[in-house]
Each structure stands twice: as structure tokens, then as C-alpha cells.
């Protein structure tokens, strides 16, 4: 059987609430005003450095490498200390992956979240064992939408990877750049209408995913 690679945030787990909490904890330490969940959700997708850049820009702060590193470090300390209290696995996601594994699929994860935090979250939800390869936002010099992380994940699976499953503009662009078909989860963190994202199939509930993959392989 071929391989399939998944994104994490907004695709397999609804993690925005914990990311939101960690950002606001870091800002509260310096007396900063909190962001709303919707605001932080809108900043997710390009990795932690870009998340923090967007937070600082939204506060009206000029780009500053020292400031970026300082806030990013405090954010990660809070996030890694409590990454999953408010996070949930999307309904049907675990069952879908277990179903695919039972059919012989090799399963990979390609995310812009740091690999340590990604493994921690997967472990807390009992999902870590389901993945044959994991590439995070700090595994390579490049991050999505550069195709290098997705290609590295595919290579690590030692199978022909035929599909990337994600939820956002970043994921769609990554799959396109890597030359892979893309399955779009419509209930994640995308900003644009579905029709504006290049995709080969879409689904709104993970129960639909195994049948969708079979159709895309036909």
C-alpha cells in the first residue's frame, strides 16, 4: 500500500485554544493585553516564528530579532508545559488513521509545529504509535509551504506517498510544490473559501477519509 502524510494543527487536532492560552500567558508576564482565540487562530499555520511575528506586528511592534526570540522562548516554555489541556482530536481522526494502518498504509506527519511539541501532543492522546515518520517545523531549515519537509516525510516512509492531508492554504501550497495530491479537511484553520484552495478531494469529517483516499487512488 502507498503512504499518506497528515498535517497536525487544524487537521488532526484542534490545538488553537492551547496555542492561544500560551501566547496570552507570555504576554501577561509583561502586562500585555490578551488576544482573542479568533485572532490567534488566524496567526496559525506557518510555524512558531511566524506566529510570534504576527503577534508582535498586531501589537504594532517593529521587527526586532531580540524581542522575537525573547517572546518566542517564553511562549514555547508555556506551551510545552501545558500543550493539550484545551486541545482535542477531531472526531473520527484516530479511527480513520487506525483504519488506514489496518489496510497497510504507511502514515506520516508533516507539520510546522516543533517536532518535540508535536510528539508530546500525539503521545498525550495515544496517537504517537500510529505514525511511521514525523517531520516538524524545526526538523529542517525549511518550513512549509517549502516542499522540503513534505518530501523528507515521504522519503522517511520508504513508500510511494500519494497524498497529503491538510486544512489550510499553507498545506495546499506545500502539496502542490511537492507534486502530491491534496485532500482538504474543510473544518480546520483555512482563511480562503474552499474553491480557492487547489485540492483533489475534500472532507468535513474524518469518517469520510478512508473512502476518499480509495477514490483518489482509483
Curated annotation (Swiss-Prot):
GO terms for cellular component: cytosol. The gene is cbbZ. Disulfide bonds: none annotated. Belongs to the HAD-like hydrolase superfamily. CbbY/CbbZ/Gph/YieH family. NCBIfam families: HAD-SF-IA-v1, PGP_bact. Keywords: Calvin cycle, Carbohydrate metabolism, Hydrolase, Magnesium, Metal-binding, Photosynthesis. One of its GO terms (molecular function) is phosphoglycolate phosphatase activity. Specifically catalyzes the dephosphorylation of 2-phosphoglycolate. Is involved in the dissimilation of the intracellular 2-phosphoglycolate formed during the DNA repair of 3'-phosphoglycolate ends, a major class of DNA lesions induced by oxidative stress. InterPro entries: HAD-like_hydrolase_sf, HAD-like_sf, HAD-SF_hydro_IA, HAD_sf, PGP-like_dom2, PGPase_prok. This is Phosphoglycolate phosphatase. The keyword Metal-binding applies. It comes from Cereibacter sphaeroides (strain ATCC 17029 / ATH 2.4.9). Mg(2+) binds at residues 7, 9, 167. Its cofactor is Mg(2+). The active site is at 7 (nucleophile). Pathway: Organic acid metabolism; glycolate biosynthesis; glycolate from 2-phosphoglycolate: step 1/1. Its EC number is 3.1.3.18. CDD domains: HAD_PGPase. It catalyses: 2-phosphoglycolate + H2O = glycolate + phosphate.
Amino acid at each position: 500500500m502507498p503512504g499518506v502524510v497528515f498535517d497536525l494543527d487544524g487537521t488532526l487536532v484542534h490545538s488553537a485554544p492551547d496555542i492561544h492560552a500560551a501566547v496570552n500567558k507570555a504576554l501577561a508576564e509583561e502586562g500585555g493585553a490578551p488576544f482573542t482565540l479568533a485572532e490567534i487562530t488566524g496567526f496559525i499555520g506557518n510555524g512558531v516564528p511566524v506566529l510570534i511575528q504576527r503577534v508582535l506586528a498586531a501589537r504594532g511592534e517593529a521587527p526586532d530579532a531580540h524581542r522575537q526570540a525573547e517572546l518566542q522562548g517564553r511562549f514555547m516554555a508555556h506551551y510545552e508545559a501545558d500543550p493539550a489541556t484545551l486541545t482535542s482530536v477531531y472526531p473520527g481522526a484516530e479511527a480513520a488513521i487506525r483504519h488506514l494502518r489496518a489496510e497497510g498504509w504507511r502514515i506520516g506527519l508533516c507539520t510546522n509545529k516543533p517536532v518535540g511539541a508535536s510528539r508530546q501532543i500525539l503521545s498525550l492522546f495515544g496517537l504517537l504509535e500510529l505514525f511511521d515518520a514525523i517531520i516538524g517545523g524545526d526538523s529542517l531549515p525549511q518550513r512549509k509551504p517549502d516542499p522540503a519537509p513534505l518530501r523528507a516525510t515521504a522519503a522517511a516512509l520508504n513508500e510511494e506517498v500519494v497524498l497529503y492531508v491538510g486544512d489550510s492554504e499553507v498545506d495546499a501550497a506545500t502539496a502542490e510544490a511537492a507534486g502530491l495530491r491534496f485532500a482538504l479537511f474543510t473544518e480546520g484553520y483555512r482563511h480562503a473559501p474552499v474553491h480557492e484552495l487547489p485540492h483533489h478531494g475534500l472532507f468535513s469529517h474524518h469518517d469520510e477519509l478512508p473512502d476518499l483516499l480509495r477514490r483518489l487512488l482509483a
